[in-house]
């Protein structure tokens, strides 16, 4: 795999500071939210995959306008659902 350079990525974002923010957000989407990579993974870490996506023009600063998916929603939703079904743990009297 060829090296990813900042200069190649800057063709798709305004400056290196925005590159860091865009790359970070996309890497989190890949690692934490389970988003599907737009480039072959090739055994790369999420940060490298994010930079490759930026370099190839699949990801740009518009990603910053997307709302993040809350991580606690699923956990709380499962807890509420189990309470509704009477599946909560209560001591027997």
From Swiss-Prot:
Keywords in alphabetical order: DNA-directed RNA polymerase, Nucleotidyltransferase, Transcription, Transferase
InterPro entries: DNA-dir_RNA_pol_omega, Pol_omega/Rpo6/RPB6, RPB6/omega-like_sf
Gene Ontology cellular component list: DNA-directed RNA polymerase complex
One Pfam family from the record: RNA_pol_Rpb6
Presence of the UniProt keyword Transcription in the record: yes
EC code(s) of this entry: 2.7.7.6
Catalytic activities: RNA(n) + a ribonucleoside 5'-triphosphate = RNA(n+1) + diphosphate
GO molecular function terms attached to this record: DNA binding; DNA-directed RNA polymerase activity
A biological process from GO: DNA-templated transcription
Assembly: The RNAP catalytic core consists of 2 alpha, 1 beta, 1 beta' and 1 omega subunit. When a sigma factor is associated with the core the holoenzyme is formed, which can initiate transcription.
Similarity annotation: Belongs to the RNA polymerase subunit omega family.
Function (record text): Promotes RNA polymerase assembly. Latches the N- and C-terminal regions of the beta' subunit thereby facilitating its interaction with the beta and alpha subunits.
Protein's name according to its UniProt entry: DNA-directed RNA polymerase subunit omega
Source organism per UniProt: Teredinibacter turnerae (strain ATCC 39867 / T7901)
């Amino acid at each position: 795999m060829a090296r990813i350079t900042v200069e190649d990525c800057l063709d798709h974002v305004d400056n290196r500071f925005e590159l860091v923010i865009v790359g970070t957000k996309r890497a989190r989407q890949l690692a934490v939210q389970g988003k599907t990579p737009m480039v072959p993974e090739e055994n790369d870490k999420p940060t490298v995959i994010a930079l490759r996506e930026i370099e190839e023009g699949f990801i740009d600063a518009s990603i910053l306008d997307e709302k993040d998916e809350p991580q606690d929603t699923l956990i709380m939703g499962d807890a509420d659902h189990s309470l509704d079904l009477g599946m909560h743990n209560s001591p027997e009297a």
